Every structure is written in C-alpha cells, then in structure tokens.
Amino acid sequence: MSRITCPITDCKCKCNKNNCVYCVMGRQGLPGPKGSSGNSIYVGTGVPSPFLGNNGDLYIDSSTGLLYAKVNGVWVPQGSLKGDPGASGSKGEKGDKGSSGEAGLKGEQGTKGEQGDQGEQGDKGDKGDKGDVGAKGDQGDKGDQGDVGAKGDQGDKGDQGDVGAKGDQGDKGDKGDQGDKGDVGDPGVKGDKGDTGDKGDKGDKGDKGQNGSEILFGLGIPSPDLGEDGDVYIDTLTGNVYQKIGGVWVLETNIKGEKGDQGDKGDTGSKGDQGDKGDQGDKGDQGDKGDVGDKGNKGDTGSKGDVGDKGDVGDKGDKGDTGDKGDKGDTGDKGDKGDVGDKGDKGDVGDKGDVGDKGDVGDKGDKGDTGDKGDKGDIGDKGDKGDIGDKGDKGDIGDKGDKGDVGDKGDKGDKGDIGDKGDKGDIGDKGDKGDKGDKGENGSGILFGLGIPSPDLGEDGDIYIDTLTGNVYQKIGGVWVLETSIKGEKGDKGDTGDKGDTGDKGDTGDKGDTGDKGDTGDKGDVGDKGDVGDKGDVGDKGDVGDKGDKGDIGDKGDKGDLGDKGDKGDVGDKGDVGDKGDKGDIGDKGDKGDLGDKGDKGDVGDKGDKGDVGDKGDKGDIGDKGDKGDVGDKGDKGDIGDKGDKGDKGDVGSKGDKGDKGDVGDKGDKGDVGSKGDKGDKGDKGDVGPVGASILFGAGVPSPTTGENGDSYIDNSTGVFYLKINDVWVPQTNIKGDKGDKGDKGDKGDKGDTGDVGLKGDTGTPGSGPIIPYSSGLTPVALAVVAVAGGGIADTGASYDFGVSSPSVTLVGVNLDFTGPVQGLLPNMAWSAPRDTVITSLATAFQVSVAISAVLEPIFLRTQVYRELAANPGVFEPLAGAIVEFDVASSALISVGTVFRGIVTGLSIPVNAGDRLIVFANTRTTSLISVGTVTGFISSGLALA
C-alpha cells in the first residue's frame, strides 16, 4: 500500500508502509487549587457564637470592645481595642462658709374654725304597691294533621333477555410449506484501521486565590457601593467602625480612646448659720364658729388625728310633728364622702296592692282550616329488572377445512452480497490531562495571642497582635519583627479644676418677736391648703342634749333633689337602732301602681282569630312513604341462538415462497484501534491568587515605592494610618486613642442657703457623700473559673448585698436577667436610688476561705455595678467603669484567711432617682489552669456624691 499523508498541519508523523500514527493533543489539565482565603473580621454585640467564622478569623464585641480570635474552633478573648481613659482632674478646693441667712419670716396664719355638723337626712317615703299584670290570652288551636300520602305505583316489568350468539365459523386450511433458504454470501473485505485520536486539550488555568478582608477608610458614612461583604470601614472623622454585611454597612463600634474624666466639681460653700427660731406667740382665743364657707378644693389628706372620746348618745327625742313642707333648699355643697355605714335593718315589706281584675278570657279562636293535604308519598321503588334470558347454546363448530397441498420447494437463493467494509477503527485514547496549575499565593493572615509569637507560628507577611500589650508583629524572612502598638496612649490627666468661689455666708436670721395674742378673726376667705398642722388636742366631751318634744305629723314633703355624691368619709360608729315608728296611714297608691292597667293586655287573647286566616297551619306530618312497588315480572328467557354454519374447507396451500436470499457475507473485521495520541501539553500554571492586602509598618511617612494599591501602612512614631490609592499613600486616621480631654473646671461653689426662719441653723453639709456597704454575709461564695486553653470570663457568678449572697447567677450575654419562669425565681438583690446621685468610687475585698495551691497563673476576681434597663424591667446592664478587678491566685500557695483588695476611684457615673443597682462578682482567667473555683467572703463599698 502507498504511504498515507498525515491530514494534520505541521504534524510530526511516524509513518510506515502500512499506516500512519496521527499525533493526538492531550486532554485539558485540571484546574489549579484555589488560593487560601484571607482571614475575616466580624463585628457584633455580646459573646460570638461558636458556629460563626473559621480558625484565624477575628471578632469584635462592639458592646465591650473585646477582641476575640478563633483558635481550634473556639473564640478566645484577646484583649480590648479601646484606649485607656485619661486620669480624672483633681478635686476643687472646698468653698468658704456662707454668710448668715436673712431675717426670719412672719409667723403663720391662725387655724381655720371647724366645720359645722351636717343635718340629718329625712325619712324616705313608702313605695307604692305594684299593680297585677293582666292575664295572657289563650293560644289558638293547632291545625289538623295532613292526610297520609298515596301508595306508590307498581314497578315496571323487567327487560327481555338477549338472544344467544351465533356459532363460530370453521378454521381456514393450512398454508403450504416454504421453499429452502439460499446459500450464504462471501465474507466482506476487512475495514481500514481507525484514525489516530486527537491531541488532548490544554489543562485549565488554576483558580485565582481569594482576597482577604480589606480595611477601608473615609470621611463620614461609607457609600453602599464601597467594598465587599466582610470588609471593615473606619470613619476617620468620628472613629466609628462599620462592617459590610449582606451588602449593607452596619455600624459596630468606635475605636477612639475614651475622653479623660472631667475634673471633680468644687465643694459647695458651707451653708450659712440658720437664724435662731423666734419664740412662739401665745395661742389666740378661738374665734366664733364661722358660717360654713363655700367648699374649697379638696386638700391633701393630713395626718389623722386621734379619735376623740365618743360622746354619750342622747335620749331619743319623741318624733316631732312633721312641720309644713318647707321650700326646697338649695343643693348643699358636696360633702366629703363618708365611709359606707353599717347596713341598716331591712324595712318592713309594704302591703301588697290589690290584685287587678283578671281580664276576660278571650274568645276561643275558630278552629283552624284543615291543614294542607300531606305531600304525596314517594313513588315506590321501580321493580327489579327481569333476569337476562339464558344465552342461546353456541352453534357447533364447522368441520375443519382440508389441509392445502404443500407448495413447491422454493428456488435456491442468490449468493449474498460482499460484506460491508469494516468500521473505521476507534479514535485513539485522548492524551493525559495536563498537570494541574500551581496553587495561587495565600493572602496575608492576622493572628492573635498572649505574649511574644512562636517562631513556628504563621507565614511570611502575616500579622500577629499581642493582646496583652497591644504590640503588633510582622513575619519577615521567618522572623517575627515588632512593628508598633495599636493601643492608644493614655489621655493626659485633666487639669485640676479651679477652686470654686466661696459661697456668700447667709445672714443669721433675727430672732422672731413673740406674737401678740391674736384677736378673734373675722371669717376668712377659703384659703389655699396649708401645710398639715400639728395634731390638735382632743376635744372636750360634749354635753348630752335635751330630749326634744315630739312634733306633729306633717304632710309628706316632696322628694328633694339628689345632692352631689359626697366624698367618702371615715366609717362612722354604728348608731343605735331607733324605735320603729308608728305605721303611717296608707297613702294614695303611688303612680307606679297605675301600671296595673297593663292588665288590659289580656284582651290580646282575640288574637286567636288568626286561625281563620287561610295560612297553612302547622305543617302536617309527612305522609307515610308509599309501599315499595312490586318487583316487575322476570323477563322471558332469551331464545337459544342458532347453530353456527359448518366451516368452509380450507384453501389449498400456496406454493412455497422462493427461498430467502443468502445472508450477506460476514462484515470484515473492525480496523485496529488507532494508536494512543501523545500526552497533551501541561496546562498553563493557574494565575496566582491576589495576595490579601498587606499591612506595612515603618517610622515616618511611607515611601511612594513601598507596597501596592490597597495596602495599609502604620507610622509607628505617630500612629497615623495610611492607605495606598492609585500609587499614592493617603493618610486615613490615627489608630491611637485620642488623648483624654482636659478635665472641666470645677463648678463655682453654690452660694450658702439663706438661714431658715426661727429654727437653729443646721450643721454644714459634710464634705463627702454616703457609702453603700455590701457583704456576702456568713456563708462564703464559691465562684466558678474558666479552666480552658486561653481562659476567659466566667458567665456564672454571684450577686450580694447587705449580708446575703445569691450564688450561681448566670449572665445572659453581658446582662443580668431576673425575668421569666426560671431566672425570675432567683433572689433579686437590687436596691433603688431615692434621689439623683453620682457614683464616685468602688472598692472590693476578698478573703480566701478555701486554700488555693500551685496555680501559678492569674485568676482575676471581678466585681461590677449593674443598673436596671428602664425599657426592660428585671434586666440589668453593666455600668462601664464601675468595675474592680484584681489577681487572687498567681502565687504558689494561697492560704485560708488571705485578703486581696482592689479599688477604682475618680468615677463620675450619674444615677437617677428610681434607678435600681446591683453588684455582681465573677472571675476571669487568661490561660489553662487546674483550679475549678475560688471560694471566700466578698465585701464592697460604693461611694456616692
């Protein structure tokens, strides 16, 4: 055979005289591995969920400023990002004592005369008898019952049975035999060898490495189009920190250091001496009892005086004759409402009025028309259909036709055609896939820990933050290099407030002149309510009044208008039961008794005439259902079918078909499989994943050639933070906390109060405020300790107050929660502030009651003041700053009786009247320790201004 020309352009074939091996392109290589993700920074409120984030990620608690790092699946506290507050300014000096107070005021007005006694209430008239109600008319007769429905019709006769089927026709005769098959054809020619397979595709490009989270900077609120989810944005004007979550910038916290505390307010000047109290004037004679004045506005209830001795009950006077009916008096002023008196005896029941004449019984209504005839009974069920007649007998099968004659043998088939050319050989196997592209480079990681980083930790370019000191390291050439510290500098101590001006001393009040004995005053106008007077002397017991003569019985007076309801007074003593009065003459029947005429309603009985109306009376009972119709006669049995015709004789068998053409010769053998194509070229190396934005450090302004766009740079000498944008280093903010503001100048001392009238001057206000003492009492408190790698703050502790403690109180997030069916049953030891005040300091001591040995790692005792949330009663939040923390177990052996102390001063935390405060103690650790609890007695003192 001739040489075969390779159909592939520029192919380097290895040909021989029989075939050619085509070069095959190798398969496409696998994609390179995805570059490692940069670490993410999360911001939220409270302790992070264990399901949030991956190892190496960061979390900022915006409520406390605590920074956490995820290590081996656990969020470990690293430290606080907020700078320390500046120191408080010095307390201003105490003001000078105020001058003496002004002259005393004129003495108070004399006491108002007592109110006259209230008149007795008249007897209530007898109630008239109620008339009898007339009799009700009789009800009309019920209509007659309807007739029974008619009997249902008889059912229809059943259908006639079907006629039997006709018999089957006889079978057709058999077909003649087929002729013999022709001879098999010759085998076909073997097919050509298949073509060489194509070269495999080029391997895929490796995946791009994933960017790390970016830290962005700007002035003001970030644009929604800025950054990607997980990025952090710092507003350099305010220090606010935002995180992009779900495409939205969410405000999380503020990184600027706290402003220094304001200097203490200067002491208030001493209060001036109060003038001596003037001598009390002689008590004036009691004025004549004044007329009852117009009722004044009801004053506040004064202190209740002693109840005077009860006067003797005077003899009951004879009932006087009823005087002529007086003119109706004006409605008196509404008196104070007396307490409900004891219930009087029940009056005698009045005589029953005469029974009204019974109304005539209405005429009996005419008998109602006969009710409509009952509905016709339902038609009886249709009779059952007659049975289907028996099917006629099947006709006899006709005789089978005679078998046809065997056909002549068919002619021998023609020789089969040459077999088809064998299929082209399969394409050679595709070349091996190209090698996987190189892995993209990882983004830089941010790591956290306690103390100097281990040389084995991290990779070149990674950042490490020591959460104990705030020192920032970068790994360069396998070595951790100290770069800077991110903790803000402590604010300068505020200047001492200027000394308040000395308050003017109040003038000493002149001694009041002894008051002259007052003349009996005219009846005064109703004045404003005065202050509650001193308790009056118990009045002398009154003389028993003379018994009055019995008056004549007068005409019964008209019922007076109902007076305004008096205010409720004190419950009076139960009076003696009066003698039963003589039964009065039966008065004219009260108007209400006329209602007895209503008895005419009995005439309504004529309504029975309604029966005359042709309206259908009560519906007659439904007629009985008609009897079920008789079952129809059974249908006649069907006729027997006719016997089938005898089958026709079978046709003579056809001549056998010509023998089939011989089979096509066997297909030639399949061509050999083409040679395997050459291995494909190695896929191109995947692009290197973008390196996470780098954080660089240096002293001074960064060089334009340093770093790449998106990198950050921290000037160690100033704390200025730069971001490289379009090849230019742009200052963004300063990560060091702002220096605390200078303490405000102390307020000028208040001017001394003017001396009070008459009374001896009070001692000046003490220089310091009250102290609220707290103690866990007679029983020591066992506080739980977090004993895991990295340590942490225990969420279970104890509250305590004035000699009592409640152990096993659990924080909910950062708050104390005394609500709900479980927490609501815990003792709530909060107390309420009775006035506005300010917390100035907190001190705590802890006395060990169970020895602690071989700890050698710090265990910090924490006590903090919590305040109830106004919007959520029963839930208390921690007061920032009102916390004391000290180490109780960092030496080899802590024996029973050892005392540890801590104090925080210079606080200025306002507390409003009505606020509820509670003190809570728990522990904090920084590493794995072997102690599960620390036990002892806790005491604290809270200083208020």
From Swiss-Prot:
Coiled coil: none annotated. Its main location: virion. Keywords: Collagen, Glycoprotein, Hydroxylation, Repeat, Virion. May be hydroxylated on lysine by the viral-encoded procollagen-lysine,2-oxoglutarate 5-dioxygenase. It comes from the Viruses. Residues 756-765 have a biased composition (Low complexity). It is found in: Virion. The keyword Signal does not apply. Glycans are attached at residues 211, 442, 716. Residues 703-712 have a biased composition (Polar residues). The keyword Transferase does not apply. Residues 80-226, 257-441, 488-712, 733-768 are annotated as: Disordered. Residues 83-142, 146-205, 257-376, 383-442, 488-547, 554-613, 635-694 form the Collagen-like domain. Residues 109-145, 168-208, 488-687, 736-754 have a biased composition (Basic and acidic residues). Disulfide bonds: none annotated. One of its GO terms (cellular component) is extracellular space. May participate in the formation of a layer of cross-linked glycosylated fibrils at the viral surface thus giving it a hairy-like appearance. This is Collagen-like protein 1.
